[in-house]
Amino acid sequence: MALLKEGGLLAFPTETFYAVGGSALDAGAVERVYQAKLRQATKPLPVAAGDRGLLGRYVDFTHVPDVLLRRWPGPLTLVLPAFPGVFPLKLLDREGRVAVRVTPHPVAAALSIAIDAPLTVSSANIQAHNPARTAADIEEALALACGGILDEGPEPEGGLPSTILEPLPDGSCRVIREGAIPLAALASDGVDLRHTEESGLLRY
């Protein structure tokens, strides 16, 4: 994928919606996503990889319960500490954490593995507009900012975006957003869920 390796952007399907993204390790590509989506600079972009081993090079899994790791690949995003100097600063929150998941979608996973890097996976829509479930739903202005649209593989399921949790040192998990994986299902798995003042905030 020469385009992605050179800092370009693609629109591609994920398990939930179409995403617009590029290499999460390339500051120029990250900036282009913000510009294309007219996204607030204070909202970090989520990141996805084709396998957990690839993510393990860049984030710290120390406090992640095994039961959550068994949900990967899947629509579960975890806010984890990033290793220093790896990701562009715009992908990090104030505590140096990044929102990551392992995507089960074969196209998105193959792209990540092909460039040997995580991808930014922000939904393919202008900020505050509806996300795109099909390639035809992608707005023209956003499509023009991408080097291409990959209209192949299984169609995204739509519905809800990924569920977002932040694993904490005491073994519990702060709820950031309930999404495609219901909180009730996670609780039944034994995950200790905590709702705080950050729960429900549109951070990602």
Give the positions of each predicted feature.
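Active-site-adjacent structural elements in enzyme catalytic cores
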Residues: 1-204
